[in-house]
Amino acid sequence: MKRISYVLVGLALSACLFVSCGEQKRKDGRTDTNSSGAISFASDESFSPIVDELKAVFEMSCPNAKVTPIYTSEVDGVNMLLKNKVMLTITARKFTQKEYDYLKGTDQLPEAVPLAYDGMALICNNKNLDSCITVNDVKRILSGKVTKWSDVNKGSKLGDIWVCFDNKKSSAVSFCVDSILGGKTIDNPNIFAAKNSKDVIEYVARTPNAIGIIGSNWLNDKRDSTNTTWNKSITVMSVSKLDKATPMNSWKPYQAWLLNGRYPFVRTIYALLNDPKRGLPWGFAHFIESPRGQLIIFKSGLLPTRGEIAIRDVDVNNKPR
């Protein structure tokens, strides 16, 4: 018998949930409604696979709407929102109290809408036999206490550990500092930032002693029609909360293990809004949290924030009956 866990979610398809209020020009010059018009919004680049999917379905459902993502870092995306360059930013944190108070003080309407749960994935080259790692070892690597694979596994001959992030100002870096290191800075000479998540994957694929840190939505990138993103050179590492990592106590960033808490590195994806008129930025953000948007998120491999979700064990026979 082989036991396989599945995540089942009760989410129903729905049509576009928002009704246009017309194109009458307002005093602020805006003509967009919650289902029509054209806007640009900011998004952390690490969420580009799921954002591209959501954009395509939203525009198909609301043919008079055009939403254009600006893929950037978490820091730059939030700053764009604070400077009123965009009214929507998709990222992995809520407003800080200082940011919220600033926007409220300028008669704005800041809102943080939870959209999905994402696992912070660790990837390594398939030549690395250490595909299981403990939370404590990840902390030691990020803090610089460990710089060689032999410090993690005495039998390893891979030499120095090189850690690659997608961007020095990305949400992945923020998560590691705030959630893994407890606010302490990353202090390892062998850590560097690439240009984006795709570059991280390519670097790890050609570097046997590397670890890449990316969002788990890249594990199921449907934009990669050639199916080359997840090639045989890449392994998704399993992470254990215990002192010693084994295949039996370590978990990958998949939906079931995000839901039941076994995978330790989980973050919430938010839509940060500053749209007091509740126009197209508001409409797109709330489409994502609607049943149809949550179904898209579920099918992408992320964990929805809304809907009834259950884990069921299913017995599968190795031999047909």
List PLM regions with ranges.
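Periplasmic N-terminal soluble interaction domains immediately after the signal peptide in Gram-negative
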Residues: 107-111
